[in-house]
């Protein structure tokens, strides 16, 4: 539940879109209180793009809870790639960007987008491509904690990337999914 305009309202998690590598979740709020209902109808819509790698949208539970008081909330819920059957095909950066574009289009031109950490670059790319194609873009774009230009604040991860070849990464950090998983 969430409190809207001083009224406790019910919240139901719904799957708005199901794709092989991600579910778009909507948190639908319900109330019989006419004043709270009017307030909810006028509140902005936000899409929270959660990190894909090593995280799940459940880690942003508190963020969603706080947004529900004064926003219509959607969030990406990325599927662990090892759980996606091979026949669904690969999932690359361009697929990630395309998913984000599809979600923005579905929600509509009034959407506000928040990307948290890792998805800042794909979200920026998605919005930039929408704009360059003459499509609507989100009302706002908030990118939290993600490196847009990682050269500006290099970390040990950046140093590793700069000091190793592409083939080193292919040979040392890409692993086959164990046979007991569909991916």
Protein language model features and the residues they cover:
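An acidic- and aromatic-residue-enriched active-site/binding cleft used to recognize and process polar
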Residues: 52, 78-81, 116-121, 146-147
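Beta-sheet entry/capping signal
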Residues: 45-46, 72-74, 110-113, 139-141
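Alpha/beta-hydrolase-fold enzymes
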Residues: 109, 122, 126-183
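Catalytic nucleophile loop
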Residues: 47, 77, 111-126
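Short, surface-exposed "cap/lid" segments of acyl-processing enzymes
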Residues: 2-84
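Short glycine-enriched, charge-decorated loop/helix-capping segments at active-site entrances
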Residues: 87-91
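Conserved acidic catalytic loop of the alpha/beta-hydrolase fold
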Residues: 83-85, 95-112, 124, 128
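Conserved catalytic-core motifs of eukaryotic protein kinase domains, centered on the activation segment
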Residues: 85-86, 154
């Amino acid at each position: 539940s969430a409190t809207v305009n001083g009224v406790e309202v019910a919240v139901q998690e719904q799957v708005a879109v199901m794709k092989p590598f991600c579910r778009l979740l909507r948190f639908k709020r319900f109330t019989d209180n006419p004043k709270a209902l009017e307030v909810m109808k006028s509140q902005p819509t936000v899409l929270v793009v959660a990190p894909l790698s090593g995280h799940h949208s459940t880690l942003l539970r508190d963020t969603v809870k706080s947004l529900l008081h004064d926003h219509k909330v959607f969030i990406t819920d990325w599927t662990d790639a090892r759980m996606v059957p091979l026949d669904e095909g690969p999932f690359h950066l361009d697929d990630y960007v395309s998913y984000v574009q599809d979600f923005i289009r579905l929600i509509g031109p009034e959407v506000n987008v928040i990307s948290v950490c890792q998805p800042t670059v794909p979200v920026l790319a998605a919005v930039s491509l929408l704009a360059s194609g003459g499509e609507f873009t989100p009302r706002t774009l908030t990118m939290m904690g993600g490196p847009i230009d990682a050269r500006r604040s290099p970390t040990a991860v950046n140093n590793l990337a700069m000091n190793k070849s592409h083939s080193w990464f292919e040979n040392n950090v890409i692993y086959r999914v164990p046979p007991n998983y569909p991916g």
